[in-house]
Structures are given as C-alpha cells and as structure tokens.
C-alpha cells in the first residue's frame, strides 16, 4: 500500500494505483523481474503500447478509467465523448480556471499535478531516490559543469501517476533553453519500482533543460519517462520568454516524473513538504499550488 500526505486535511491517504497487481508482480516477483528486464523496460514494448493508445480502438478504455479513478471531467476542455483516442484523453488540457496560479513573484508553484518530495542541501553524488537508494546528478544529466551549479541546492521531485493531469508547466517567468534528450529504459516510476531498481532515474529515458528564471535563479528541469510513456513532448520554444504557468510540455500514456533542481540560497520549500519527505512520504499537489517561497 502506498500512502501519500494530503496537505489540506493533514492526513494520509492510500493511493489508487493503475495496474497495481501488474506493477507488484513485475517488480517484486522473481519471474516478473525477469520479464521486466527482458521486455517491459525496452523501448519497443512502450512504443507498441503507445501506438495502441493513439488508435480509435483505445477509446473504449476512457470511460472505465475515469470511473475507476474518480477523475473530474468537469475540469477538462473536452467532453469525454470528444476524445479521439486514449492518449488524446490522457494528454487532455484543462479549463483555464481549473488550476489557479498565484501571481506573486515570491511564490514557487508546483509545475504539475502529482506527488511531491523535496530535499535540501543536496549532495550531488547521493541524491535520494527513495529511502535507502541514491543517484548522482552528474549521471542523471551527463553534464558535470551544469550539475556543479546545484551543489548544496534543493531537489524537488514530482511523480505523476497515470490518473493525473499529464501536462507540466513553468514555475516562473523567464527564458527556457534548449532541450537535451538522453536515451534510456522505460522502468515504472511507481514507488514499488523505485525500491527495486537502483538509480532508476539515471536508467530511464529522460530530457533536461535550463531555465533562466526571473525570480528563482537558474532552474534545472528534468523530465523522466516511464513504462508505456512512448513520448515526452516539449511544447515550448527555446530562448523565447515565457510567463509563470505557461505550458512546457506533456507526457503521453504512463506514469512519469518531473525533477527540478534549484541553486543554493534561491528558494525555501514549504515546511510540511520537507517534513513529509524526511519521513518518507510524498505530498499530493496540483499544478499551481504553492510549494515554496523565494529567499529574499
């Protein structure tokens, strides 16, 4: 059972997991682990499933998915019968007023919907993946010069599960720079998998870019793919100014992760998120929600 912290009620909730039995089998049983290494983590598997999710045939999955996970379709721009495929539904846009954004330049917002953890004063060679497992930022982006900027900084991890809104956004106004894709595998990013696969984020397909933020110094954006995520789509234009809350991109079907690195002395993450992260719990957040403040 995966428990996440509800910041509003200040209580823990059990996460509803899409494909829970499959994930537990593939990452916790000997046979499942073998199948994962031979098939499930491969690009071909995710590519083929992604192709299916682009077909009209996949539309039949939408209504049962919405019902099973209580997805509020009133927030969607499209009605449920207007989607052309499951991926069309999965990458749905929300109504303009569905996610209010705090315009205060000193407020840091969540870049998307999901479950968030944050770590302060990070050791670049031992960043927490999950309790007991770490990874290196240099391995994650394959760029020592960029990685060194974030020594003793802050790492914010936003895990999106298949039931979430899957578009991610800029946390401030500023100028985004070129995207750097890195080839990799397609392991699940569910906590069950994170406990099983060392340096999972460094193993998976991922993309990174620098963002010259107006208020939070230089921010490192990283998007990590996962099982069945055939594509990470970047919708922004490099070196073109963006506003706070503008869309950066989206993930096609599957769970996925956005990771942000902040320079030392740039931000302060809300105390409840830091506390829960130390305890080993994620906090449930939505795009636009306040998660921290600028260091003045």
From Swiss-Prot:
Keywords: Cell membrane, Decarboxylase, Lipid biosynthesis, Lipid metabolism, Lyase, Membrane, Phospholipid biosynthesis, Phospholipid metabolism, Pyruvate, Zymogen
A GO cellular component annotation in the UniProt record: plasma membrane
Pathway connected to this protein: Phospholipid metabolism; phosphatidylethanolamine biosynthesis; phosphatidylethanolamine from CDP-diacylglycerol: step 2/2
Keyword Ribosomal protein tagged: no
Cofactor binding, note field: Binds 1 pyruvoyl group covalently per subunit.
Catalysed reactions, semicolon-separated: a 1,2-diacyl-sn-glycero-3-phospho-L-serine + H(+) = a 1,2-diacyl-sn-glycero-3-phosphoethanolamine + CO2
Membrane-spanning residues: none
Gene Ontology BP terms: phosphatidylethanolamine biosynthetic process
Molecular functions per Gene Ontology: phosphatidylserine decarboxylase activity
Subcellular localization(s) per the UniProt record: Cell membrane
Site residues by UniProt (Cleavage (non-hydrolytic)): 255-256
Listed InterPro entries: PS_Dcarbxylase, PSD-B, PSD_type2_pro
Membrane topology, record value: Peripheral membrane protein
Keyword Lipid metabolism: yes
Post-translational modifications reported in the UniProt record: Is synthesized initially as an inactive proenzyme. Formation of the active enzyme involves a self-maturation process in which the active site pyruvoyl group is generated from an internal serine residue via an autocatalytic post-translational modification. Two non-identical subunits are generated from the proenzyme in this reaction, and the pyruvate is formed at the N-terminus of the alpha chain, which is derived from the carboxyl end of the proenzyme.
Cofactor: pyruvate
EC number: 4.1.1.65
Positions of modified residues (Pyruvic acid (Ser)): 256
Family: Belongs to the phosphatidylserine decarboxylase family. PSD-B subfamily. Prokaryotic type II sub-subfamily.
Summary of the function given for this chain in its UniProt record: Catalyzes the formation of phosphatidylethanolamine (PtdEtn) from phosphatidylserine (PtdSer).
Record note on quaternary structure: Heterodimer of a large membrane-associated beta subunit and a small pyruvoyl-containing alpha subunit.
NCBIfam families on file: PRK00723.1, PS_decarb
Protein name: Phosphatidylserine decarboxylase proenzyme
Native species: Clostridium beijerinckii (strain ATCC 51743 / NCIMB 8052) (Clostridium acetobutylicum)
Gene assigned in the entry: psd
